[in-house]
From Swiss-Prot:
Domain VPS9: 321-471
GO molecular function list: guanyl-nucleotide exchange factor activity; SNARE binding
GO CC entries: early endosome; late endosome; plasma membrane; transport vesicle; tubular endosome
Source taxonomy: Eukaryota, Fungi, Dikarya, Ascomycota, Saccharomycotina
A UniProt-annotated Pfam family: VPS9
Protein name: UPF0507 protein C2_02840C_A
Natural source organism: Candida albicans (strain SC5314 / ATCC MYA-2876)
GO biological process, one term: early endosome to late endosome transport
Highest taxon of the lineage: Eukaryota
Similarity field: Belongs to the UPF0507 family.
InterPro entries listed in its UniProt record: Ankyrin_rpt-contain_sf, UPF0507/Ank_repeat_27, VPS9, VPS9_dom_sf
Length: 1189
């Protein structure tokens, strides 16, 4: 433990105070952190840490101090408040409860924190629960592993952390948020509530009212009600009689209501109070209007059928019998007027842009007026509303539009067009119904009377009393002839008509009301019809017969007013004759000004698309008009013209289309550069995402000036690489794999899928496809070339994993360069690694405890953690495979095959351990009888002590280096996050945003993390080797203890032998050779017959020792014999271990150099990618700053 008297120092401070408090705290042994550290030390895989963003902790205040004069920053709580720390650490190994919704399959899990509070995690949202003062709902930003570099947590331990958008205690921002804008209350809300009330609803809502009047209304509306039989009989009668009968019924209905509150009625008082209550509930309600509409509702079918019957009677004597019932607009008249054009109605408007506005109003007015024929319109109020809306469309200006003057003549002309083209049967009956069956008395309503008078005027215009009616029919006939000839591709007919016109107007302009200038209600002229017909001869006959007939303004301003598509757009969409398109473009380029050309080619339709969005229909136009196109203009789907070109997947000349489009864009924006961020759609797709093929032709990756992020994720968290694999775009895949900026193993921040996951998804659909196999080979070969040692003759890689619900275990997918692949469950893999270590107990192969240190085997956890954990475990598997290619102690070929083959017969672990133990014993026995002298053991001991000291020094220095690399990785992340924050806040579009984009959404791992893993792996191998050396040193110490025990026993035995034997022995020893036995070995002993030891009267011992000495001698001999057996076994063990360790040391010295070199190469490669990525981001920033100047 660190002494409190010494000056305390620690590594560079982490930017996130919470992480710094837990992992870089020199006061970890003091409160409030001591208890937390003790619990995390015990089993760190059981816990997950919830980490708020750094800027929240550094800038926000504790909510409990909101009303205090001295507010406390949240970062202070990280160091001084144990409750705060414990509240952000959850025990994910033992959830309180876990439920899964049956339909969405979302899992909701409740966890306890270290201080027994509770949180709920559902759909990546964290909800505070029991124990928390405030109920909060926080989004999870990302899930990561944090590598601990401190000394008070287990070495090489990794902690799972979840970045959340704020603390579980909340936080007060440094500046007050602006209050939300007050909601604009609808002033007519009460009116809308009243309008929604009907008498029928009141009857359903108030049973007392229904009881008072429903029976009487039922009898009133019954078909057997003889009192009002006139409406039931379909015979000829005047419309005034129908109106009179309706008024009688209406008065009867009013009487029913008044009788219900009559004093003679026993329930009158209750009914009266109820009606007053209803009036108080809906202030301003008109009960008379409700009753009127109720009567209409019940009698509408009868009334309407009577009106239709009367209007459809022959008009022979109606002039005298009932002039109101004359039917004017019959089906025949509608047919004769069906091709009537607005320009033939003598309105005082002739400018093409104003005519477009009027045509749009007419088209919208027709759509609205047609609602009169809808079967749902069943009362006078609804019919009146339709008429009002139609007049509003025809007369009121829309925002941003040019406002033509709508005088009386213009309005009549618009109404004529609306009534003729809406073709409503019995329009006269509708107008009569609106006038005479209305629930509101409109006698003094000027607007209503003005509208009705205009409708009457239009009807009068079509009557035989108006001479202009015949002119309208004649104009419609002429329009029909030319339109029909064009649509039917009748060139001869068109030519004959044009010849007649040419004879009449040889060198002059056509009058405004001429049929060649006619348009339908959508604003489409003969020229538009010719373009849609796709016949150049007809088009040429119309536009080139006489240049005076169709001025340039007519071409520039002609469009379909409903789609807002001009002539060129329609020509491209209809894919008309290329000669028509070329001629139309030439006319515009030769006759319009540059400003007019730019406006024309960039005007947008209702989808927000310009001509540029439709150029894929004729991409050769790009060379003509591409320089006039705004390639950055987005449509309603956020697609630019260039984006639309890239999405035209079924184009027969797709590559040429891409080449033409991009070359034009580079030529136009070459000086300032192309801003590729403006070509991103609302789903986050970049041009690289949507491009089907032709990356070389687009020059997006090859042009060094292009600021393209090849790793950008769309809103579905797919990078271009993932898209190419998912949708089998082999050509693009090959190209992007050659880009040095590619983050090949990058994972998305939502599902944590990488390219191999999407490869496996595609494999389920198209495993037999040749294209897919090529994609699979390209991806795997890229991995081997860039992430696996190239010198290796054997290889295997763990690619991805899937969860097997049946086995309730993860299956890891392995594959080698020869194409062999297999799935292995984690349990099976754990057994394989365990048995390998049993077979090679003294090798540097990682032990079970070391390898699975950061993977909580068998620990249940939320699905949102699974993918992150398994991805990091896959990384460890690949490190294992990479490391083995630099080692010789383990048979690589045999080891790799165990992951690629499926055993047909499974063997229990117990049987496998037995066989391995027997094999190890056999290997040791094969060494034969092994004897060691002390000097030999001392030589081995010296070698081991030297190696141990050397490796301990190396381990100490390497551990410090690994720690610095680890902290360097964390500081890399801090620097990146701080720079991201600065760039975000310096951006003019986000500087005033209250909503902050958290840096923690991104992957919180630096490039030094790659080097760290290799340092850790070498460190783990070194620890295994140190452990083996220490074990052998321990065996040698045991051997020496046995050796000295034998020496001691030999000394005692010599003292018990006869004197002359001892003297002789001393004489022999004096010759210069130190022997410990008669066979010149301390491990030898002369066998003594037992009968000599047992018989007191026999043998030389009986002459000078007593019975007690005999027993002790026997005991020493037996003890020596046992020690000799043990030391002989230990000799075998030492020799076997010594040879293995010597080989392992040699192998490790080579391994640590080569593997570290490979790791450094990997780090440098990732660092270069990161620097290029950051360079692109900063260059974009500079580009935008310069562009804004």
């Amino acid at each position: 433990m660190t002494s409190t008297n010494k000056s305390i120092s620690h590594l560079p401070i982490l930017h996130n105070p919470f992480l710094n408090c837990l992992f870089n705290n020199p006061q970890y042994f003091k409160s409030p952190l001591k208890g937390v550290v003790d619990e995390l030390q015990s089993n760190h895989t059981n816990f997950t840490i919830l980490v708020p963003p750094a800027h929240v902790l550094n800038e926000y205040y504790d909510p409990t101090t909101e009303s205090s004069n001295s507010k406390t920053l949240l970062k202070e709580l990280c160091y001084n408040n144990e409750d705060f720390i414990r509240s952000h650490i959850i025990n994910t190994a033992s959830p309180v409860s876990s439920t899964i919704t049956p339909i969405s399959k979302e899992q909701s899990v409740i966890y306890n924190t270290l201080n027994n509070k509770q949180i709920l995690i559902k759909n990546r949202i964290i909800y505070t629960g029991k124990g928390f003062r405030r109920s909060l709902k926080l989004k999870t930003l990302s899930i990561q592993y944090f590598s601990s570099f401190c000394d008070y947590f287990p070495k090489r331990s990794k902690f799972m952390i979840i970045y959340i958008e704020s603390t579980l205690f909340g936080g007060i921002p440094p500046r007050k948020m602006l209050p939300p804008l007050p909601e604009v209350r609808e002033t007519n809300k009460t009116d809308k509530d009243i309008d929604s009330v009907t008498f029928e609803k009141l009857l359903r809502s108030f049973p007392l009212l229904s009881k008072a009047v429903s029976d009487k209304f039922y009898r009133l509306f019954h078909h057997n009600n003889y009192q009002f039989r006139v409406l039931r009989y379909k015979n000829r009668k005047k419309l005034s009689h129908i109106k009179l009968e309706f008024q009688k019924i209406l008065q009867e209905a009013f009487s029913i209501i008044s009788d219900s509150v009559n004093v003679d009625n026993p329930n009158s008082e209750q009914t009266y109070n109820l009606i007053n209550h209803i009036i108080s509930m809906y202030p301003g309600i008109d009960l008379n209007k409700l009753v009127h509409e109720y009567v209409e509702l019940n009698l509408y079918d009868v009334l309407w059928s009577q009106l239709i019957f009367q209007f459809n009677c022959p008009n022979d004597d109606k002039e005298a019998y009932d002039p109101e019932a004359i039917l004017i607009l019959t089906k025949e008249k509608y047919e004769k007027l069906s091709c009537l054009s607005l320009n033939q109605l003598d309105i005082p408007v002739n400018k093409p842009w104003l005519m477009n506005e009027l045509h749009e109003r007419i088209s919208l007015g027709v759509q609205e007026f047609e609602k009169l024929a809808d079967s749902s319109i069943m009362n006078s109020a609804a019919k009146t509303q339709v008429v009002y809306s139609t007049f509003r469309i025809l007369t009121q200006r829309k925002n941003g539009n040019i406002d033509p003057v709508i005088n009386a003549d213009t309005l009549i002309g618009l109404l004529i067009m609306v009534m003729v083209h809406s073709k409503i049967e019995n329009i006269e009956a509708h107008i009569y119904y609106i006038k005479h069956f209305n629930s509101i008395d409109n006698t003094n309503d000027g607007q209503f009377n003005y509208i009705m008078s205009n409708l009457d005027a239009v009807l009068f215009h079509f009557s035989k009393k108006e001479s202009g009616y015949l002119d309208l029919i004649e104009n419609s006939k002429k329009n029909y002839e030319i339109w029909n000839a064009i649509k039917n591709n009748d060139l001869e007919k068109v030519e004959s008509i044009i010849e007649l016109v040419n004879n009449e107007y040889p060198e002059t302009e056509l009058p405004e009301n001429h049929f060649l200038k006619s348009k339908n209600i959508n604003g489409e002229s003969c020229l538009m019809f010719a373009i849609k017909t796709k016949r150049y001869e007809i088009y040429d006959c119309l536009i080139n017969s006489n240049p005076n007939w169709i001025p340039i303004d007519s071409i520039l301003f002609e469009k379909n007013v409903m789609t807002n598509q001009n002539l060129l757009m329609c020509a491209l969409i209809e894919e008309t004759d290329y000669k028509i398109i070329d001629d139309l473009v030439d006319i515009i380029l030769n006759n319009a000004t540059l400003e007019e050309q730019t406006m024309y080619f960039n005007m947008t339709d209702i989808s927000g698309r310009s001509v540029g969005h439709y150029l894929f229909h004729n991409y050769k136009l790009i060379s003509k008009i591409g320089h006039l196109i705004d390639w950055e203009k987005k449509d309603n789907n956020s697609h630019t013209p260039l984006f639309s070109l890239c999405r035209c997947y079924d184009h027969p000349e797709y590559v040429e289309l891409i080449r033409a489009g991009f070359n034009c864009v580079y030529k136009k924006y070459g000086e300032t550069g192309v801003d590729y961020d403006k070509h991103v759609d609302k789903s986050g797709n970049t041009l690289l995402h949507v491009l089907l093929k032709g990356i070389p032709e687009s020059k997006m990756l090859s042009n060094s000036n292009n600021l393209v992020n090849v790793n950008q994720l769309n809103q579905r968290c797919l990078s271009p690489l993932m898209v190419y694999v998912k949708y089998n775009r082999l050509e693009n895949l090959k190209e992007i794999l050659h880009d040095s900026r590619l983050d090949f193993l990058g994972e998305d921040f939502k599902n944590y899928y990488n390219v191999f996951d999407y490869l496996s998804f595609s494999a389920l659909k198209s495993t037999k496809s040749e294209n897919f196999q090529n994609i699979e080979n390209a991806v795997f070969n890229y991995y081997l070339q860039n992430y696996f040692p190239r010198h290796a003759t054997e290889n295997v890689a763990a690619l991805n994993a899937k969860y097997d619900g049946g086995k309730k275990d993860w299956l890891i997918f392995f594959k080698n360069g020869d194409g062999f692949c297999n799935y292995k469950s984690l349990r099976n893999i754990k057994q394989i690694l365990y048995l390998i270590k049993l077979k090679q107990p003294l090798s540097t192969f990682p032990s079970e405890e070391s390898f699975w240190k950061n993977y909580g085997f068998g620990i249940s956890t939320s699905p949102m953690f699974h993918k992150v954990r398994i991805n990091r475990l896959i990384d460890d598997f690949n490190l294992l495979f990479e490391g083995l290619t630099f080692q010789e102690s383990i048979n690589q070929s045999e080891f790799f095959k165990t992951f690629l083959t499926e055993y047909t017969k499974e063997t229990s672990i117990f049987e496998s351990k037995q066989r391995i133990g027997e094999q190890l014993d056999f290997d040791k026995q094969s060494l034969g009888e092994v004897t060691y002298k002390l000097n030999q053991i001392q030589e081995i001991e010296y070698f081991l002590e030297y190696s141990l000291n050397n490796f301990q020094k190396y381990a100490y220095l390497f551990a410090r280096l690994a720690k610095l690399v680890c902290i360097g990785d964390s500081k890399q992340v801090d620097c990146r996050n701080v720079l991201d924050t600065i760039m975000y806040r310096f951006n003019k579009t986000t500087v005033f945003d209250d909503i902050f984009t958290y840096s923690e959404v991104n992957n919180q791992a630096g490039t030094l993390g790659v080097a760290r893993e290799y340092f850790y792996w070498i460190q783990m191998h070194g620890d295994e080797l140190l452990h083996s050396i220490q074990k052998l040193v321990s065996d040698i110490n045991s051997w020496k203890q046995m050796y000295y025990s034998i020496c001691h026993i030999n000394s005692e035995l010599k003292l018990m032998e006869p004197h002359n034997t001892v003297s002789q022995e001393s004489q022999d020893n004096s010759n210069g050779q130190e022997l410990l036995s008669r066979r010149d070995s301390s491990l030898s002993i002369n066998p003594i017959p037992e009968e000599e030891l047992e018989d007191d009267n026999l043998g030389f011992l009986s002459n000078f020792v007593g019975t007690s000495k005999k027993a002790r001698y026997k005991k020493l001999v037996v003890e020596k014999s046992e020690i000799v057996k043990n030391i002989m076994k230990l000799n075998l063990e030492i020799k076997w271990s010594h040879e293995l360790i010597a080989a392992e040391i040699s192998d490790f010295l080579k391994f640590r150099t080569e593997f570290l070199r490979f790791g450094i190469k990997r780090y440098i490669s990732e660092e270069i990618k990161s620097l290029k990525q950051r360079s692109t981001e900063l260059s974009k920033y500079v580009f935008l700053v310069r562009k804004d100047k």
